[in-house]
Amino acid sequence: MGSLNTEDVLENSSAFGVTNPLDPEEFRRQGHMIIDFLADYYRDVEKYPVRSQVEPGYLRKRLPETAPYNPESIETILQDVTTEIIPGLTHWQSPNYYAYFPSSGSVAGFLGEMLSTGFNVVGFNWMSSPAATELESVVMDWFGKMLNLPESFLFSGSGGGVLQGTSCEAILCTLTAARDRKLNKIGREHIGRLVVYGSDQTHCALQKAAQVAGINPKNFRAIKTFKENSFGLSAATLREVILEDIEAGLIPLFVCPTVGTTSSTAVDPISPICEVAKEYEMWVHVDAAYAGSACICPEFRHFIDGVEEADSFSLNAHKWFFTTLDCCCLWVKDPSALVKALSTNPEYLRNKATESRQVVDYKDWQIALSRRFRSLKLWMVLRSYGVTNLRNFLRSHVKMAKTFEGLICMDGRFEITVPRTFAMVCFRLLPPKTIKVYDNGVHQNGNGVVPLRDENENLVLANKLNQVYLETVNATGSVYMTHAVVGGVYMIRFAVGSTLTEERHVIYAWKILQEHADLILGKFSEADFSS
């Protein structure tokens, strides 16, 4: 037999003297410190560069190569958070953050997350934590009623709702359910003939879900959209593509209209798309990840008209509903389709409650087994602010976006590239008048008359100009915006949605944009943007 060395004996014996990792008083002391730390962070968040200014690999150079052998104090750790971690953060909660889509937070959302994490239950089935399951079904019905969803999507009717991590998971789960429902009718050997449809503006989550679900990559359709339809998916074009696929021996399976696309917040017409899908027995999933939250406001509800004809509907409460990441709300008309596709029932999970068929086991509504108590934070948000205040928060963001849109329209150097629908404005800086095209077939610059540049060359020049312009603005650290390319046009996205953003911040962002427009146009040289 071997023998323990002295260091091992000392290490093992001293471990019995270590403070319990869940000591209540230490939890109280350190918890207060963390709350104070975060409160100070939000008080001062406006002072930080919105986008991190670090270079790739910065953190590995600053941190030790191995974990500490002995414990370190919370004070030391928080000091390192300040000096090492915060410089590497892009501050999504900054009032000057307008990039991507918002990840709006709130006190209620943060504290709900704290409660959820603090309880640390794993609610894979009803028995594992009844409150986690039952609260989820309650808040999903609450939220569904706020959206005026039909009873067919609610537990009070024949459907039901579940909290997923993200829209990617929601789309994958519904696509998997649609796949199995179809293959159970036609035979699993036909999986290679199934086709999934979206538009060229549909989120990439649909394509990834199709790959994971085993759909032939050649059978994924990203149908082209056009400016005259505000880049929405045309039901007529969808029908044409479906008919071509049927003629080729393929089988239409799934279509995903979007309410508020990522690039431009375009809205696909739900009802006409559902009419087409119904003819070919397709599953319709409505992805309202960004804009769905706004539909609790009566003036925006019409954007999801026709949802009663769809099979499933999802939105991200962690985007524009003041609930921390992650919290995707998914409603389905036929929960049994999800359960049949995703259910497993090993012996070690069997219990009387499940066998009674009187409870929901959410493990069968998702990909993973384990699941977080997400409903607690959504419940706290709904209760802490109420429907009236939540509507007013959303309206305030739309109002600020309208203000920004008005400022853009007042300056002839800019143009709105797509219509504003919600709280995001898409715009671009126009090339200077020194390259204006004249009717006589030539254009002028500072050096005199030069041959006419064709439309494509003008577009390339304008796109490069806006790319450089956006990079210059973001490099200041004062504001942060991102871009999209829609219809070949490079445009800047200004997405209002941070909980801390006020009108003064929007005015501040506009002044920065104006200042840098002055600079970049003042030294404009065609050669600078032609490469």
UniProtKB/Swiss-Prot annotation:
Pfam families xrefs: Pyridoxal_deC (PF00282)
Enzyme class: lyase
GO MF term list: 5-hydroxy-L-tryptophan decarboxylase activity; L-dopa decarboxylase activity; pyridoxal phosphate binding; tyrosine decarboxylase activity
N6-(pyridoxal phosphate)lysine: residues bearing it: 319
EC number: 4.1.1.28, 4.1.1.25
Catalytic reaction annotation: L-tyrosine + H(+) = tyramine + CO2; L-dopa + H(+) = dopamine + CO2; 5-hydroxy-L-tryptophan + H(+) = serotonin + CO2
BP GO terms, sorted: amino acid metabolic process; carboxylic acid metabolic process
Cofactor(s) this protein cannot do without: pyridoxal 5'-phosphate
Tissue expression: Predominantly expressed in the roots and stems, while a lower level expression is seen in the sepals and carpels of fully expanded flowers.
Alphabetic keyword roster: Decarboxylase, Lyase, Pyridoxal phosphate
GO cellular component: cytoplasm
Top-level taxon: Eukaryota
Function of the protein: Marginally higher substrate specificity for L-DOPA over L-tyrosine.
Similarity section: Belongs to the group II decarboxylase family.
Subunit structure: Homodimer.
Name of the molecule in the record: Tyrosine/DOPA decarboxylase 2
